[in-house]
Regions:
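Extended hydrophobic alpha-helices typical of membrane-associated regions
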Residues: 250-275
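Topogenic membrane-insertion module of multi-pass membrane proteins
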Residues: 1-51, 55, 150-153, 163
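Hydrophobic alpha-helical transmembrane segments
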Residues: 16, 24-28, 46-54, 99-103, ...
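C-terminal ends of transmembrane helices
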Residues: 64-67, 87, 141-154, 202, ...
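Small-residue-rich segments of transmembrane alpha-helices in multi-pass membrane proteins
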Residues: 25, 29-33, 161-176, 223-227
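Intramembrane alpha-helical segments
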Residues: 84-182
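Membrane-embedded alpha-helical segments that form the functional core of polytopic membrane enzymes
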Residues: 33, 41-66, 131-144, 184-204
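Solvent-exposed interhelical
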Residues: 66-108, 195-240
Length: 275
């Protein structure tokens, strides 16, 4: 009996490790920002927030699992990898079992996503329902195709672009639309401001793995750059996010006085990188 309990605990620990739950806050950021934008115009709804929260979490988990599986199949997660070993590469979960787990997460994502769209619009707004179902399908495909398949976009340097689109623009603009049912071009500013540092998270990981990725034919943006240019690009993403957020604050709330202290912070960034 004790052996069975120990095995169950080991299985749970292996799956928790495979899901990479520590990355979930990255998916929550877009949900929280969309909720804040909706609340600022008085249309926040808890039901939409909760369903959006779980949909974003499941998409992040699916992306993590697909990344693990794709790199394992292509042999990228070898001994040369600097970061922590993934669940498949370490042998903690069998490949067939892992694929079944991905399928379950995919079904859960579709179910919760459908509930989110119907809660936001109902069946009467069938045009919006179909639009967001198509958008949701695109999110699922993008989550899987990062490293899975012969044309995985993560292996051709497009990872940061897709993260910018889906973790930034789609999460914030699409999420806010689910609350309001209307479009505002100003949402592109906070959406892009979130998308840039989200891309920075991926870029920083790829900088860490650049040497191993080059050896395994994974042509990420970081593997095509020198370390110096990679760090400069990382700083550009962060600075760009700050500038876009300031522009949005000024356009929406006329908070021009924020520019001065922020400019002083930006001046110090090159010094910080040199140190």
């Amino acid at each position: 009996m004790k052996e069975e309990d120990t095995k169950k605990k080991a299985d749970v620990a292996a799956w928790a490790y495979a899901l990479r739950l520590r990355t979930l806050p990255l998916s929550w950021a877009g949900t929280v920002m969309a909720a804040g934008l909706a609340a600022s115009v008085g249309v926040f709804r808890w039901s939409v927030f909760v369903l959006m929260f779980f949909t974003a979490s499941l998409l992040q988990i699916l992306s993590n699992m697909a990344n693990d599986y794709g790199d394992y199949v292509k042999g990228t997660d070898g001994e040369s990898r600097i970061g922590p070993r993934r669940a498949l590469a370490s042998g903690r979960i069998a490949p067939g079992e892992f694929v079944r787990g991905m399928f379950v997460v995919c079904l859960l994502t579709m179910g919760v996503g459908l509930a989110l769209v119907l809660t936001a619009f109902g069946w009467r707004a069938i045009g919006y329902v179909l639009l967001f179902l198509a958008l949701g399908a695109g999110c699922i495909v993008a989550a899987v195709k990062y490293t899975v398949g012969r044309r995985a976009y993560g292996y051709s340097g497009w990872g940061e672009v897709f993260v910018f689109l889906f973790f930034g623009l789609v999460a914030v603009c699409g999420g806010t639309f689910l609350y309001t049912g209307r479009w505002d071009a100003l949402w592109l500013l906070p959406g892009a401001a979130l998308g840039l540092p989200s891309s920075g998270v991926l870029h920083l990981n790829n900088l860490r793995d650049a040497e191993g990725d080059r050896a395994n034919g994974k042509n990420t943006l970081a593997s095509r750059m020198s370390l110096g240019w990679g760090l400069a690009f990382q700083c550009g993403l962060i600075v760009g996010a700050i500038v876009l957020l300031l522009v949005y604050m000024d356009a929406t709330y006329r908070m021009t006085l924020w520019y001065l202290p922020t400019a002083l912070c930006l001046i110090n960034i090159p010094l910080t990188v040199q140190i």
